[in-house]
Amino acid sequence: VYVTGSNSKFLSKDVITEFRGRGDEIHVYPLTFKEFMQVYEGDMYHGWAEYVVYGGLPLTVTMKTEEQKINYLTRLFEETYLKDIIERHHIEKSQELEDLVNILASAIGSLTNVPKIEATFRSVVQSNISGNTIRQYIEYLEDAFVINKANRYNVKGRKYIGTPLKYYFEDVGLRNARLGFRQIEETHIMENIVYNELRSRGYSVDVGVVEKRGLNSEGKTERTYLEIDFIANLGSKRYYIQ
C-alpha cells in the first residue's frame, strides 16, 4: 500500500502513526540534474541553463515551450502549494504568507533569522507581523515541502549555532516562478541545487562556521567568522564543500 501526500506533518502524524513499525517514509524529490539530463533532449550546456530556470519537476521536462513551463510552475505554486497551506491552517492574512515566501525566495543562500525577516516586513512591506507568526509560517512552508533549512555548525566548537541560518527551496523552478522569473542569479541558485543534490543522496546538510581570532589594527583581539558553504553528513562520512 502506497500513501502519498504533500504535507509532512499529515504524513508523519497520521499515516506513520497508524502504520508504526509496518511502513517506511520515502521523501520523493524533484529530479536531480543528472536525472534531468537523462530525459532532456539536448546537450549539458543547454540542459543546465534550462534546469537553473525551470528546476526539476518532472512535468516541466516534457513541456516544449517556455510559456508552458512558466504557466505550469506559476499556477502550481499559487493554486496548489499556497492554497493548500492557507486552507489547511486557516490563515486569514494570506498576503503575509505570500510576502514571507517572496522574502525567503529573494534570500536563498543568505544567512537570515526571524528578527531580520521581521525587520524586512516592517521596512519594506510596512507590516507589523509578529516573530511568532513568522516562525509558524516558516514551519508550514517546511511541512509542505516548499523550503528546507540548513543550520549553522561551528566546526571548531563542534556545536550548532541557533541563528542565523539559511533556507533553500525544494525546487528552484518553483522559487523562480514565485519571483516571476526576475531574479535568476546563477550562483545562488547553484548553491540551492547543490544543497538539494546532497539531500537527495541522503546527507544531512549544515552550513559550516570557523571562528578565527586575531589582532586588529589597534592590537585588540578580534573574532572573525569564516563560512564553509556546506557540511554534508551521512553516518561516518563527512564532507566539507566550498
Where does each model-flagged region fall?
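Conserved nucleotide-sensing/catalytic segment adjacent to the nucleotide-binding pocket
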Residues: V1-Y2
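Residues at the C-termini of beta-strands that transition into short coil/loop
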Residues: G5, Y29-T32, D171, V209-E211
